[in-house]
Amino acid sequence: MKTEKNAQLRLAKRPQGEAGPDDFELTHDQVPSPRDGEVLVECHLLSVDPSSRTHWNAGQSYRSMVQVGQVIDVGVAGRVLESNHPDFSAGDYVVGPGGIHEFGVIPGDQLTLCDTRIAPLSSWLGGLYMTGLTAYFGLLEIGQPKEGETVLVTAASGAVGMVAGQIAGIKGARVVGVAGTDEKCQFLINELKFEAAVNYKSLTLYNDLREATPDRVDVIFDNVGGPLLDTLFRRLAIGARIIVSGATSQYNNETIY
């Protein structure tokens, strides 16, 4: 292991607008060794989420920014190779914050043990990790949907949106999704059993929304922001709740909408 190289993707420079290949650098370094309380993880799966884009800018955010030269930070799931933390042993599968690399040293206190008998490793990094928890707590603690209410989810075919829509359905709400293609809208209706779905690129967007939400909208779970959210405001019911989960339409913009 000590002679094996560790492929890592680093931030070469801060992107201007949409990120491209020149903004990143692939390096090959020595595999690191864990210190006290740390765990060496062989990364099998990476969760590269839209919110990662916000960490590559200059300035401040709700979390620390990736500095130029640093490894791009993402959620990872993988196998423990070496552990200096009492809760983990070699061979365990874990999920937690890491980077785009083959091998990473992660503080054990930031890792969760994955029982792959309960769910596959991909689920531990998806619906049972950050995207699923974002949907779960955002919808239930802030949205608090009630049976019979209308819940509208933007970016509904994305990782967070799909889970939010399923939870809303379990709670007995009427679920409407917004997505960017007709194929995604059909997926929401046919596979995820949304009551209705609207393509936000439609030339008749507001009329489509009005038809899909005849009783207006009680809860908006918004992952997109920008002009689309402005349009959705016009469909709000009295006493409506809005979960501001993300703003994917704005992550590549240099100016705030």
Per-segment meaning from a language model:
Residues T204-D215:
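Short amphipathic alpha-helix with an adjacent loop that forms part of the alpha/beta core around
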